[in-house]
């Protein structure tokens, strides 16, 4: 009896250390690691050590949580999509090992579970860690801009360390720009200094990258905020964004004039041609795509995440993919008055729109594409789980005599 009590106490204390200390640290490391980790492989190790392994241990210690965590409609939709993609390996010729590919949905599932555990056990720490990550992105952006202008800078800001090219920097910093847009929308004074300074620094960095992908995403995020948030502030932000775009065009006209459509119509046309060869089931997950442009350039992706899903999984895969987003946005619209939901959904809108003009990796290991898809999706999933638990407890209170 005494031994059982001690074991129960040990399990409780270990779970608390995980949920209140290690997992918040892991969440913060995931969101900020690309700013200070010099190598992408080290970023993966950070995820495995500080987030994936502790989350798995927590679920083992608290198995009662597994049923509600896996019973969410959003998680079931993700499970259906990822299972289908893993099944498609049977007719694919993947470029990576099957074992490596099979682990990727598990990593995303552990990300979901981590966010949900934090939302249930330490919601304030989840909120604080996310805010600290957003602040860290601003500090990193300021340091990156200083270094860029201090050095004999090239035409485009490429980034440093794990963010070694303009697109990677644009994806990650663009995601945090969308986050600060939502923070500004939720601040009481319209001229709240911290959000505005943050937006100015992040916006300046995005312009310096020369990438137009985040501009597409931020425009969509602003439109979402017009619909779901404070309409007056969102319209003001839209006007400021247009003014910023005009200023950017004056300072960096080559961003628009020199690169045109960057071969996107030609890329998408050839991607659709290849998709038409296997329209229903697709070519299979991780099947190589080769697109040869008219100038002889060889590309390995369609520069559109949804086309990547359609190429790999066909129409069936795309429908399962759309189901994930439909559930996420249905929940977001229904709960748009919640500041946390508005924050996460704005981030998700940014990622969805940005992915329409760049990218292909929809089930990757932890990297920049997670900032477009799976991190904001995990936040919405966590808030959904949190809401279901709160409703369940209210029902128990009402039923109690």
Curated annotation (Swiss-Prot):
Consequence of gene disruption: Lipopolysaccharide (LPS) from this mutant is devoid of B-band O-polysaccharides and semirough. The mutant is also deficient in the production of A-band polysaccharide, a homopolymer of D-rhamnose. Mutation drastically affects the swimming and twitching motilities of the bacteria. Reduced number of pili and/or flagella can be observed on the cell surfaces of the mutant bacteria compared to their respective wild-type parent strains.
Enzyme Commission number, as recorded: 2.4.99.26
Enzyme class: transferase
Outcome of swapping residue 264 to A: No effect on activity. Can complement a knockout mutant
Family indicated by similarity: Belongs to the O-antigen ligase family.
Gene Ontology terms, MF aspect: glycosyltransferase activity; ligase activity; O-antigen ligase activity
Inhibition and activation profile: Activity does not require ATP and magnesium ions.
Impact reported for residue 303 to A/G/N: Loss of activity
Reaction(s) this enzyme catalyzes, per UniProt: a lipid-linked O antigen + a lipid A-core oligosaccharide = a lipopolysaccharide + a polyisoprenyl diphosphate
Subunit text: Homodimer.
InterPro entries: O-antigen_ligase-rel_domated (IPR007016), WaaL-like (IPR051533)
Region (WZY-C): 258-319
Cytoplasmic face of the membrane: 1-20, 62-72, 123-129, 184-189, 230-234, 332-339, 386-401
Membrane topology according to the record: Multi-pass membrane protein
Gene: waaL
Function: Transferase involved in the biosynthesis of the lipopolysaccharide (LPS). Catalyzes the transfer of a polymerized O-antigen molecule from its polyprenyl diphosphate membrane anchor to a terminal sugar of the lipid A-core oligosaccharide, finalizing the biosynthesis of the lipopolysaccharide. Required for the attachment of both A-band and B-band O-antigens, two forms of O-antigen produced by P.aeruginosa, onto the lipid A-core receptors. Important for cell wall integrity and motility of the bacteria.
Note: Was originally reported to have ATPase activity, required for ligation as an energy source. However, it was shown later that ligation occurs without ATP and magnesium ions, and that WaaL cannot catalyze ATP hydrolysis in vitro.
Periplasmic side: 38-42, 93-103, 151-161, 209-212, 253-306, 358-368
Record keywords: Cell inner membrane, Cell membrane, Glycosyltransferase, Lipopolysaccharide biosynthesis, Membrane, Transferase, Transmembrane, Transmembrane helix
Name of this chain's protein: O-antigen ligase
Lineage start: Bacteria, Pseudomonadati, Pseudomonadota, Gammaproteobacteria, Pseudomonadales
GO cellular component: periplasmic side of plasma membrane; plasma membrane
Segments passing through the bilayer: 21-37, 43-61, 73-92, 104-122, 130-150, 162-183, 190-208, 213-229, 235-252, 307-331, 340-357, 369-385
Subcellular location: Cell inner membrane
């Amino acid at each position: 009896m005494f031994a059982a009590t001690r074991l129960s106490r040990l399990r409780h204390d270990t779970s608390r250390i995980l949920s209140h200390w290690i997992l918040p640290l892991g969440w913060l490391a995931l969101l900020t690691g690309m700013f200070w980790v010099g190598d992408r492989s080290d970023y993966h190790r950070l995820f495995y050590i500080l987030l994936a392994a502790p989350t798995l241990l927590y679920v083992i210690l608290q198995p009662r949580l597994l049923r509600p965590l896996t019973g969410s409609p959003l998680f079931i939709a993700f499970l259906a999509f990822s299972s289908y993609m893993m099944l498609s390996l049977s007719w694919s010729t993947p470029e990576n090992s099957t074992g490596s590919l099979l682990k990727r949905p598990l990593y995303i599932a552990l990300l979901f579970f981590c966010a949900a555990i934090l939302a249930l056990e330490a919601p304030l720490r989840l909120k604080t860690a996310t805010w600290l990550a957003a602040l860290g992105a601003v500090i990193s952006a300021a340091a990156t801009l200083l270094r860029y202008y201090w050095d004999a800078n090239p035409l485009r800001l490429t980034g440093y360390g794990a963010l070694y090219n303009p697109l990677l920097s644009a994806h990650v910093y663009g995601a945090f720009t969308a986050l600060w847009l939502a923070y500004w929308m939720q601040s009481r004074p319209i001229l709240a200094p911290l959000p505005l300074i943050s937006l100015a620094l992040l916006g300046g960095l995005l312009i310096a990258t020369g990438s137009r992908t985040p501009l597409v995403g931020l425009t969509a995020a602003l439109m979402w905020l017009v619909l779901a948030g404070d309409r007056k502030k969102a319209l003001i932000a839209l006007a400021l964004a247009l003014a910023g775009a005009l200023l950017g065009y004056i300072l960096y006209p080559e961003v628009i004039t020199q690169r045109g459509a960057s071969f996107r119509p030609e890329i998408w046309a050839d991607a659709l041609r290849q998709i038409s060869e296997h329209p229903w089931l697709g070519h299979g997950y991780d099947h190589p795509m080769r697109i040869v442009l008219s100038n002889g350039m060889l590309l390995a992706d369609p520069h559109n995440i949804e086309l990547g899903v359609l190429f790999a999984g066909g129409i069936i895969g795309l429908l399962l993919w759309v189901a994930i987003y439909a559930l996420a946005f249905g929940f977001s619209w229904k709960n748009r008055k919640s500041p946390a939901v508005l924050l996460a959904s704005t981030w998700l809108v940014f990622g969805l729109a940005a992915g329409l003009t760049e990218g292909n990796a929809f089930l990757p290991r932890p990297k920049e594409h997670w900032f477009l898809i799976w991190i904001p999706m995990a936040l919405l999933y966590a808030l959904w789980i949190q809401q279901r638990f709160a409703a369940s407890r209210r029902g128990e209170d009402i039923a109690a005599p």
